[in-house]
C-alpha cells in the first residue's frame, strides 16, 4: 500500500470539498426546517411548562379556597352547636320552672281540696253526732232505764246504725 502525498492531498481536498458542499446544501435546504422544528419543540416545551405552572397555581388556589371554606364551615358548625346548647339550656330552665310552678299549683289545689273535704267531713260528723246525741238523749229521757236496759238500748241503736 503505497499511497503518495499527492493522493492523500487529493483525497483530503475531495473529502473537504464534499463536506463543505454537504454543509452548504444542508444550510440551503434543510437548516431552516431543522431550526424551525427545534424552535417549535422549544416553544411547545415552554408552553407545556407554562401550562403546568398555571395548572399548579390554579390547583393551589382551589385547594386554598376549599380549605378556607372548610374552616368557615367548621366555625359555623361550632357556632350552631353552641347556639343549640344555649337554647336547650334556656328551654330546660323554662321547662323545669314551669314544672315546679305546676307542681306547686297542683299541690296547693290538692291541699285546699283536702282541707275543704276535711271541713265538710267534720261538719257532717258534727251534725250526725249532734243528731245521735239528741236521739239518744230523747230515747234515754223518754224511758227510765237501769244500767242494763240503758246498755241494751245503746247496743240496739248502734246495731240499727250499722244496718243503715
Curated annotation (Swiss-Prot):
It is a single-pass membrane protein. Pfam families: ATP-synt_B (PF00430). InterPro entries: ATP_synth_B-like_membr_sf (IPR028987), ATP_synth_b/b'su_bac/chlpt (IPR002146), ATP_synth_F0_bsu_bac (IPR005864), ATP_synthase_B_chain (IPR050059). GO terms for molecular function: proton-transporting ATP synthase activity, rotational mechanism; proton-transporting ATPase activity, rotational mechanism. It is found in: Cell membrane. The chain crosses the membrane at residues 6-26. PANTHER family: ATP SYNTHASE SUBUNIT B, ATP SYNTHASE SUBUNIT B', CHLOROPLASTIC. Belongs to the ATPase B chain family. This is ATP synthase subunit b. It comes from Streptococcus sanguinis (strain SK36). The lineage of its organism: Bacteria, Bacillati, Bacillota, Bacilli, Lactobacillales.
